[in-house]
């Protein structure tokens, strides 16, 4: 999607749809309606007849009779004193959705000055909302190939200061959109398109376009590193595992890297502890952690942030077969620790364990892993909030602040020592499942056994990685959750 900034007024716009905003304020709304009626007399009847009051996310469409600007959309922002950055994101999303419904290809949005919100932040919010809501995973739909799509987006303002601030965030916004779109596409892709080998090829391709060094460790190398967790989960699949290493060097050579680890289970049947048939098709998204980790490093690189970042992705399928690992097996990980397999559907923590051990070789500044790890997190937090656990207060604080800025909510869960009792084994160091109670916490505690001497945080995106319906700027399907969060963390490191 093409983005441009224009230091012009409303009358100078040339777009299929032009969006302007109004607060829920009688005096301000009356003034705006008067101004619009003066500039566009043909719209006066609609302005008088439509009961538009400026409430948040409400909108009316005015027909101007002007070929270069046939429609003006008036969108409500709600009470002026209640305006937030998230309100602006949602307003941008309303503009893009309404424009798409009109089969518009070009959209201009007015970047108004907002009290208490910087021009850069308000501009970014409008762009985010408009761009993120414009996503559809439709590559396999063979009908309507000629259907018009929104492809050009202009932010216009009469203020030189606002225009300058907006121009300063265009590259960042484009990078964000590219990273989120990549993550969504990877998560939504069917398993016959994205499996370990093709995920690795995708990483190589996007890495080349973003000046990211990509190294693919094959099964032989994985075996030599004694990554027992990744190898055990892979036993049931005819497709070999891969371990993806992506390195972006935007900081100083002496700067320690920020490491992102993403769970890359490209399809999860549950293995021998097989899942119910209902909803199993969604298990193509069990690699959303990997999708977001790859999308995040691409976004960071495209935004040219001055930081060193490494993404690690252990990838395999979890399949049942005569050679699959089974409950009761004991496996040895890269760091020498052993685990009893209680449930083969608790496989994500096994592949992440080896990746967290491998992360130590980079002497990282911090490590954050993302994974669709536990159904328990969905029960606890639903599809709205990501579970956060970790060992470092500063890192968790950075994540929480980024979550507030991006509206990608997180909620911290405790890692109290008493929960360790739930993953004790009689025959190995630990076991891979602690039962139904505190499932999200015990999964994180399992991972804690494999971290090195570095600050670590774990994000359980089991609920937030997939949406069952379209919401404001989150589409149905893979959400791309975590990309904007990680990009914001890197930006403010």
Indicate where each model-derived feature is located.
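Short amphipathic alpha-helical segment within the helicase RecA-like ATPase core
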Residues: 1-264
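A generic structural signal for tightly packed, nonpolar segments enriched in small/aliphatic residues
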Residues: 51-52, 200-493
């Amino acid at each position: 999607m093409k983005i441009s900034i224009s230091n012009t007024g409303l009358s100078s716009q040339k777009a299929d749809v032009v969006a302007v905003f109004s607060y829920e304020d009688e005096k301000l709304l009356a003034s705006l309606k008067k101004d619009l009626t003066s500039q566009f007399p043909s719209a006066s009847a609609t302005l008088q007849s439509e009961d538009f009051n400026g409430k948040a996310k409400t909108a009316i469409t005015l027909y101007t009779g002007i070929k270069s600007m046939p429609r003006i959309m008036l969108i409500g922002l709600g009470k002026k004193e209640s305006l937030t950055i998230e309100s602006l994101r949602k307003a941008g999303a309303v503009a893009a959705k309404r424009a798409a419904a009109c089969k518009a290809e070009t959209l201009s949005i007015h970047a108004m000055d907002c009290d208490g919100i910087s021009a850069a932040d308000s501009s970014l919010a409008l762009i985010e909302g408009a761009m993120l809501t414009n996503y559809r995973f439709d590559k396999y739909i063979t009908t309507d190939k000629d259907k018009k799509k929104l492809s050009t987006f202009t932010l216009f303002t009469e203020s030189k200061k606002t225009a300058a601030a907006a121009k300063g965030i265009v590259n960042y916004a484009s990078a964000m959109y590219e990273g989120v779109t990549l993550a969504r596409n990877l998560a939504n892709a069917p398993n016959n398109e994205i499996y370990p080998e093709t995920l690795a090829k995708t990483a190589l391709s996007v890495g080349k376009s973003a000046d990211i060094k990509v190294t693919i460790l094959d099964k032989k190398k994985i075996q030599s590193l004694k990554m027992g967790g990744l190898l055990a989960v892979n036993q049931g699949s005819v497709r070999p595992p891969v371990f993806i290493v992506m390195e972006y060097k935007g900081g100083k050579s002496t700067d320690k890297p920020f490491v992102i680890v993403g769970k890359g289970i490209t399809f999860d049947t549950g293995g021998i502890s097989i899942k119910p048939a209902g909803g199993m098709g969604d298990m193509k998204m069990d690699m959303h952690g990997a999708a977001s980790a790859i999308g995040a490093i691409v976004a960071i690189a495209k935004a040219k942030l001055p930081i060193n970042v490494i993404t690690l992705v252990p990838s395999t399928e979890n399949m049942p077969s005569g050679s699959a690992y089974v409950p009761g097996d004991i496996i040895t990980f890269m760091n020498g620790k052993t685990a009893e397999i209680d449930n083969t559907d608790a496989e994500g923590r096994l592949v992440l364990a080896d990746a967290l051990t491998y992360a130590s070789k980079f002497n990282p500044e911090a490590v954050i892993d993302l994974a669709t790890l536990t159904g328990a997190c969905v029960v606890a937090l639903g599809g709205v909030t990501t579970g956060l656990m970790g060992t470092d207060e500063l890192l968790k604080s950075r994540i929480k602040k980024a979550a507030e800025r991006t509206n990608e909510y997180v909620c911290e869960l405790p890692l109290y020592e008493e929960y360790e009792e739930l993953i004790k084994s009689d025959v190995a160091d630990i076991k891979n499942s602690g039962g139904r109670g505190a499932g999200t916490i015990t999964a994180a505690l399992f991972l804690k056994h494999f971290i090195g001497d570095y600050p670590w945080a774990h994000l359980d995106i089991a609920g937030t990685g997939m949406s069952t319906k379209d919401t404001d700027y989150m589409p149905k399907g893979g959400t791309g959750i975590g990309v904007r969060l990680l990009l914001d963390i890197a930006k403010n490191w």
